[in-house]
Amino acid sequence: DFIQTNTKADIVDINMGCPVNKVVKNEAGAKWLKDPDKIYHIVKEVTSVLDIPLTVKMRTGWSDSDLAVENALAAESAGVSALAMHGRTREQMYTGHCDHETLARVAKAITKIPFIGNGDVRSVQDAKLMIEELGVDAVMVGRAAMNNPYIFTQINHFFETGEELPELPFDKKLDIAEDHLKRLVDL
């Protein structure tokens, strides 16, 4: 109720994927991935008091991906509006590679809500692979946007036209960075 009364939020997102120790030691973030029932009850409780959409981001699991589908289905059946999954376990943190096989299994299992694939989306081709081969409904770009904030334009352009945009010239990248800095200062 606080969120809807005191903010202008259009959506609430629960991050069940945060792998850092200071979060998981407090029984939060990726720690919840060990217990699909807990995921269900948390999502059910939050959706019962919200009039705006609730989304969840999670990882494929804690130390393995055995519960990935079960965790995703728990969130879906509890009423989440969309689910994003990072294709690494908590144990992996940010190392290794995105587990495409697990994301594809979850994409097949989730049928009532949009499923968003995340992890190693560094290019238009990575986004295309996730959508066309893994079956996700959308992609979430993470750390790759720090090196290439233009990636969102590139991906959108590709899916709208079927054409890849050329790499931005360095001076254009500097102009964009300067614009972002000015906007940050204006906040």
Stretches with model-predicted labels:
Residues 1-69, 73-76:
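Active-site entrance/lid segments in N-terminal catalytic domains of soluble metabolic enzymes
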Residues 17-19, 57-63, 88-90, 120-122, ...:
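Active-site beta-loop-alpha junctions enriched in small/polar residues
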